[in-house]
Amino acid sequence: MEQFTQNQNQPHTQESVQNTNVSQFRNETVINGSPVSGNPDGTDPSGLRRDPVQQHLEAERQERAQIEAGKEICRRRFGGATCDDESAKIHAQFDPNNRSVQPTEFYRFNDHEINKYGYF
């Protein structure tokens, strides 16, 4: 009881309170005997654990975002028409600036090369 009253009478400055929490906010802590940053056992640089389920959910989220982007491209390209998920994936991967071979369904068949030779 005496100790409690003595601690209560001591003034606590904000600096002394902040110094007790410094190690909690820095990335200098050690998890499982190795530093957090660059830890090969599933921790990312922010120090959060990333389990396989979370990685799977993130992959699904990225795939869904890619499909939505492809559907938006379909709507713009085909005047508001919708397309299925597989076509949306292909549309999202199509790059009009890429000169390598891409799926033929994306070429405009009224191009002068096709009209002139019948093939490309």
From Swiss-Prot:
Example of a GO biological process term: viral capsid assembly
Database matches in Pfam families: Phage_B (PF02304)
Post-translational events: The proteolytic cleavage of the internal scaffolding protein B releases the scaffold protein in order to continue virion assembly.
Listed EC numbers: 3.4.-.-
Swiss-Prot/TrEMBL site (Cleavage) positions: R76, R77, F78, Q93, F94, R108, F109
GO-annotated cellular components: host cell cytoplasm
Superkingdom of the organism of origin: Viruses
Keywords tagged on the record: Autocatalytic cleavage, Host cytoplasm, Hydrolase, Protease, Viral capsid assembly, Viral release from host cell
Biased composition (Polar residues): 1-37
Any GO molecular function: peptidase activity
Residue numbers spanned by region Disordered: 1-65
Subcellular location: Host cytoplasm
Database matches in InterPro entries: Phage_B (IPR003513), Phage_B_sf (IPR038149)
Keyword Protease in annotation: yes
Stated family: Belongs to the microviridae B protein family.
Function: Participates in the assembly of the viral procapsid in the cytoplasm. Forms first a 12S pre-assembly complex with protein H, and F and G pentamers, then twelve 12S complexes are joined by the D protein to form the procapsid. Internal scaffold protein B is released from the procapsid upon genome packaging. Autoproteolytic activity cleaves protein B and probably facilitates its removal through the pores of the procapsid.
The protein's assembly and partners: Component of the procapsid complex composed of 60 copies of the internally located B, 240 copies of the external scaffolding protein D, 60 copies of each of the viral structural proteins F and G proteins, and 12 copies of H.
Protein name from the UniProt record: Internal scaffolding protein B
Organism listed in the record: Escherichia phage G4 (Bacteriophage G4)
Lineage: Viruses, Monodnaviria, Sangervirae, Phixviricota, Malgrandaviricetes
